Amino acid sequence: MLKELIDKFYLEREKEKRRKDKGRIRFFISEAGKCPRMIFFRFKKVPAEEIEPERLRVFEEGEVIQQRILRHLLSLGIVRATEIQIPPQELITGRADAIVSFTDKTFSDLGIDLEEKIEPGIPYVLEIKSISGKINSKKLPLPDHINQLQLYLHYFKIKKGILLYLNKDTQEITEFVFDYDQNLVERVLNWFSKLKEKIESDVVPIRLADWPNNWQCQKCEFSEICKIAGEKEISWEKLKREIEKLEELSQ
């Protein structure tokens, strides 16, 4: 009864979100380093498999955790801005969770002794990520998250950033501080540029090397069409013809 109503709410909200995303012309910054084939299919408006309401609620929980942490940090007076959109440009769009900075008394007034030296007034881009307890903490920080943070540092012209992870199961917090890495940013931007060329030339990218064991493959919304496309690059027009043939055979 209530379950059906709640599930329907999440499914309809996700459909509306996808409708809005269909008109996009730029990459989302969170896609840095993600599966190129998945991104290609999203740009080509390929019908995606429906995401289970349970997973949608998990995604929402991550947003709730982010807001909760930001409220705590705001109360400490260290947050300078939240939900900051990167400057408009042709390739990428996105917004950072927050920019924070500290005074020389931020920690001492609370009786906190830090081993590392904190420079007063220096801004840090903050990205908050919630993770499952199934993720081995030794694997943190995740490469995709590092790519995303480095792009924020690049577009905001800020030299330092913080990746803050909160384990949803244990509530343990882990943080990593990064300096701006120009070489990494150039590699990521080049990766995006090459993917844009494939999208514009209608070339479906190669499958992930560790398919189907990569974590992105486990519940991918394009798993069936990815199987049809095969391992190597394929023209988008040829793939569409392959899909049409299979649809005709199934009728």
Give the location of each predicted region.
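Metal-dependent nuclease catalytic cores that hydrolyze phosphodiester bonds in DNA/RNA
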Residues: 1-125, 132-134, 143, 240-244, ...
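A residue-level signal for conserved active-site and pocket-lining positions in enzyme catalytic cores
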Residues: 35, 152, 220
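Hydrophobic, Leu/Ile/Phe/Ala-enriched alpha-helical segments that form helix-helix packing faces
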Residues: 69-73, 77, 153-156, 196-199
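Amphipathic alpha-helical interface surfaces
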Residues: 121, 145-148, 188
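Residue-level recognition of conserved beta-strand positions in structured domain cores
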Residues: 128-130, 165
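Metal-dependent nuclease catalytic regions and adjoining charged, substrate-binding loops involved
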Residues: 138-140, 155-251
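Short, charged, amphipathic alpha-helix that recurs within catalytic cores of restriction-modification
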Residues: 141-155
